[in-house]
Amino acid sequence: MARQLFKRKKFCRFTAEGIKEIDYKSVDLLKDFIAENGKIIPARITGTKARYQRQLTTAIKRARFLAFLPYTDQH
């Protein structure tokens, strides 16, 4: 009685929407890729391609530095 795992096909949101560059000022977009505790959600969970994951990480870090996003959930 092995338990069957259903794997959903992951897709990259940025290639589907045709986004070329991720901007650090689009806070609503960046919040979708941050967990409740403030950590960046990895690409293996979100399905984001490596190129966009690097852009996403850089944009989130810039937004944190400029105080558009909090570093943790306790701020």
Curated annotation (Swiss-Prot):
InterPro entries according to UniProt: Ribosomal_bS18 (IPR001648), Ribosomal_bS18_sf (IPR036870)
Q: Which GO terms describe its molecular function?
A: small ribosomal subunit rRNA binding; structural constituent of ribosome
Query: What is a biological process (GO) this protein takes part in?
Result: translation
Q: How does it assemble?
A: Part of the 30S ribosomal subunit. Forms a tight heterodimer with protein bS6.
The protein's matches in HAMAP family, at most eight in alphabetical order, are given as: Ribosomal_bS18
Extract the PANTHER family matched here.
30S RIBOSOMAL PROTEIN S18 (PTHR13479), SMALL RIBOSOMAL SUBUNIT PROTEIN BS18M (PTHR13479:SF40)
* Name listed for the protein in its UniProt record: Small ribosomal subunit protein bS18
The organism of origin for this protein: Chromobacterium violaceum (strain ATCC 12472 / DSM 30191 / JCM 1249 / CCUG 213 / NBRC 12614 / NCIMB 9131 / NCTC 9757 / MK)
